[in-house]
Amino acid sequence: METIIEEYLRFIQIEKGLSSNTIGAYRRDLKKYQDYMTEHHISHIDFIDRQLIQECLGHLIDQGQSAKSIARFISTIRSFHQFAIREKYAAKDPTVLLDSPKYDKKLPDVLNVDEVLALLETPDLNKINGYRDRTMLELLYATGMRVSELIHLELENVNLIMGFVRVFGKGDKERIVPLGDAVIEYLTTYIETIRPQLLKKTVTEVLFLNMHGKPLSRQAIWKMIKQNGVKANIKKTLTPHTLRHSFATHLLENGADLRAVQEMLGHSDISTTQLYTHVSKSQIRKMYNQFHPRA
């Protein structure tokens, strides 16, 4: 089965153009699947049946896997078995009648405007890495881009004169996101003054660099966000996507068009963007008081 898995992973990388992070998630799911089948002495893919898969799912649930993780696991193995049939590696698909568990799609905590401002103002602008961190935080909130997109930004992707950034998202899909005056000011200083000091003797077009002149990792940016969150005394749980969620929520709360927000976020399905249309109770009360004739 290992050979078929590798063929499948090659297929989704080349044919579907999925990101390395997504492929990594597929690989981890299929490794769990293969390990379980090996433990149960399954030597061929056609020996797998629906009952065995359900037992595998029960094993994952016993390990504490969430409903969301189980749903993704089922999606992965379903796609894998469909590939196996299409490529003549298997004669049957044991996932045909398999149901995915339902789970609530919930957003992580969203920061309010005051909390965002507190977070943005935390880095020390008198330090090189502090100015860089402030610029990254400003850019994340100004554009709603993913951290994985931020770390791959190159100089040529930023047009400060026209005021936009070219972002390459999942599957290398390109989108143009406008920039506001505040983030343009920080980017200008960073590119002209701060980045050359970080660059040193390194030759790279990557926009954001660490103190050794190398591209920053996702883990480094996540750590930076969490540390600044603590300094800003923010009690909510911060994740690499917190500013992205806050960006979308604040736009929609202030009347932005859902389709425009979908475009800026790079969502292929508008139902994903609709998750952000939750409005706080205070916002609902404010809208009611403002617009209802008998309020």
From Swiss-Prot:
Keyword Magnesium: no
Location relative to the cell: Cytoplasm
Predominant place of localization: cytoplasm
Main function: Site-specific tyrosine recombinase, which acts by catalyzing the cutting and rejoining of the recombining DNA molecules. The XerC-XerD complex is essential to convert dimers of the bacterial chromosome into monomers to permit their segregation at cell division. It also contributes to the segregational stability of plasmids.
Subunit and partners: Forms a cyclic heterotetrameric complex composed of two molecules of XerC and two molecules of XerD.
NCBIfam families: PRK00283.1, recomb_XerA_Arch, recomb_XerD
Protein name: Tyrosine recombinase XerD
